[in-house]
Amino acid sequence: MAEAADTPGMTPSPARRWLRRAGALLAGAPLLAGLLQLSAPAAQAAGPASAKEASDTGTVAVAVDSLSPGALTDGDTLTVSGTVTNNGKQAVTGAHVNLRVGSALTTRSAIDGVAKHPDALTGDDGSEVGGKYAATFAKLTPGVAEHFSISVPVGKLDLGDDGVYPLGVAVSGETAAQQWDQVLGVQRTFLPWQPEEADTPTRTTLLWPLVSTVHMTAETGSDAQQTPVFLNDDLAKELAPGGRLEQMLSLGRELDVTWVIDPDLLASVDAMTGSYRIRGDGDTTTAGTHQAIAKQWLGDLQDAVLGKEVVALPFADPDLASLAHNGTGVAGSLSQLKEATDVAATTVETVLHVTPSTDFAWPVDGAVDPSIVKVATSAGADKVIARGDSLTETGDLTYTPSAARPIGGGTTAVVADARLSTAFEGDLTKASASTLAVQEFLAQSLALNQQTGKQRSVVVAPQRMPTAVQARAMAQAVTLLQGGTWSQPQQLAAAAKAKPDPGATTKVPSKSAYPSSLRKQELPRSAFEQIAYTQDRLDNFKVILANEARVVTPFGRAMNREMSTSWRGRNTAANTFRQSVQAYLDTLTGQVKLIDKSETKLSGRSATIPVTVQNNLVQGVDHLILRLTSTNPTRLEISDDAWAEQRVTVSGGHTSTVKFTTSANVNGQTRVIAQLYTEDGQKYGNEVAFDVRVTEITATVMLVIGGGVLLLVLAGFRMYTQRKRAAARGAEETEEAEGSEEDGENGEDGADGAPEAAEPADGPEQATDPESRPERDSGAPPGAASAQQPSDGTPDTAVESADPSGTGERVDR
């Protein structure tokens, strides 16, 4: 409603001020109508209706950029600073900014109501502090922001009992169209008032998450150190001064909080401290250069967590809800969660040198249903961090119960307070928004404490990845809370062990109660099917490797990252990452392969077929079986069977050729298939098929062979006949010699002359006869051999010798 300015230096009662303003309106409206010659509707607009319109819109925006101290105690001076901006078309004259304190808000829902409409002019903002505790402006020009700052001693605020008081920062003034003092804009916030220590302070646990998106790929270098490859350089930006993770660390180390850490983040930063590469376009990579930033951040974190409680999430912070709703029906999905949990503690211990707790599971936004709880506890966790807007109170409790409560099966639900946990989720880039968030957080915390005198444990679980400005607002609020008078810090483990309230809800909501907005962001079933396919391919690949850890470790962690909660709302990026992991694994497995063969020709009944295995990996492979199969074993056999196998071992960067013995039964073409197998009978890689053409025994070959045999037979027959003729001539010559001796002739001369006349005809042919050489060498007496000339026909005379035939000698009969 429109309000007139109070008399300077006086603080009249609200009722009196309202009556005075109403009277002025009723008396002045007709006068204004007459003076301005307005129509009846216009005159009504200048009256109460005009005031309602102003209350709905507010022509001047008020921004409270700072409020100090956030939690008041006796003797403090409240300082409120900010800006007022005239968003109207007319200048505002006689403007002044005042503080208004309303009645104490006794319930948390009452605080919600004020926070829901912080700038509505229709609210009851209580009495105006007035007096000199105001900021005045002669004129507010349209579109121009004016700064103000008001300081008021706490004693002037007339605060009563302990509690939460609404504080309205209102600007009043008049315009040319409405020439009376009225409220033109307001901004409401909260003043927590607890000057003395609370009788029963609330034990508050604040989770401080160090979680990021996926940064590392499955790729590593071929060097001994296996240089890692990052998706981009975004992690360096988060670690650099002013970056999100740098702010989370520098702010959190000054607070008493429970560090909740994704081990994948630690592994990624640790990898950045050494040599690393950044993926570029295509298959290119560039060298990373932010080792110093990574080392600084990691060293600071190691110092910050000393003596503090550290909770390790499963590696890469897997999406438990997606797994429960879409992944349990895919073989191996729960095994991935178990592996991510098992490696978490080792990673944290190795990098931070502290022993973390791994028995807490944290579903997205603390939303649970029976399937999520079942999956969350399947890997060993027995405590589930839920949130109050999921595990809602259905009983008759008039206060917020402690966080811990049993939900069956030996599982404890640690229910974070929904209001406190979501206080910093909005856009806090403006200082005014951040200030309002801090004050609302403190107000809700104090109101919670004042609900009952019972000792309670409260958990605050903020969003997983606060922005830098959200982190600063969180840190400011926690600093004020831990320095206040109604709360004490407590570790998460202690909160989980606190005695549950008997009336607190222990029933996990049904699956249908799971928020649809969260369900839309889940990883689909196809994502888990692809992960399972990748795992199957990896299992088939690792068994052949001499050093499987070089491949199993980076791909195992990459598959953990494929299930990360950080993919929510980023379906395209998630799918691209999964595809890249699969493609890189296919590239590696393809480095061990059979070299293609062209058609092979076999000439003869049997031959060997070589098949070459190539290994382009940097490490050796073994436990491989090469099988060569004939598709037509009746025509072509492999080692006397349809197929044969041989074990294969190939060093890194080398090839190995395996030879198979084949035998051909029929001429023609046969298809042969070479295939690698693992020792357990699984196919490895693609088969290589090639044709084998057999040209064993053709008609032409048979004709040639037959002709050769015939020639040998004819040659032997001729030799036989020649020897018979030579023997007959020798007998005749002997008889003639004997007759000559009886007649008194010189037998020696006659005997020598007759053979010399016959020798030219027989000697050369016998010398060239192949049969003559073995007979001479093996059967002639030593003395006779030395007395003969190369052209002499000694075999013919030796055949007639009475001595036994020599070994291997053919003897004519």
What are these model-predicted stretches?
Residues 185-302:
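Active-site beta->alpha N-cap acidic-glycine motif
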Residues 1-45, 706-720:
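Secretory targeting and sorting signals
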Residues 83-91, 612-619:
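Asparagine-centered strand-capping/turn motif at beta-strand->loop junctions
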Residues 33-57, 70, 90, 361, ...:
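C-terminal region of N-terminal signal peptides and the immediate post-cleavage residues
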Residues 236-240, 250-253, 257, 342-355, ...:
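Catalytic grooves of carbohydrate-active enzymes
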Residues 120-159, 638-666:
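Intrinsically disordered, low-complexity Pro/Gly/Ser/Thr-rich segments with frequent PxxP/GP/PP motifs
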Residues 156-167, 666-673:
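Short glycine/proline/serine/threonine-rich loop/turn segments at secondary-structure transition edges
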Residues 539-542, 546-698:
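Membrane-proximal extracellular "stem/stalk" segments
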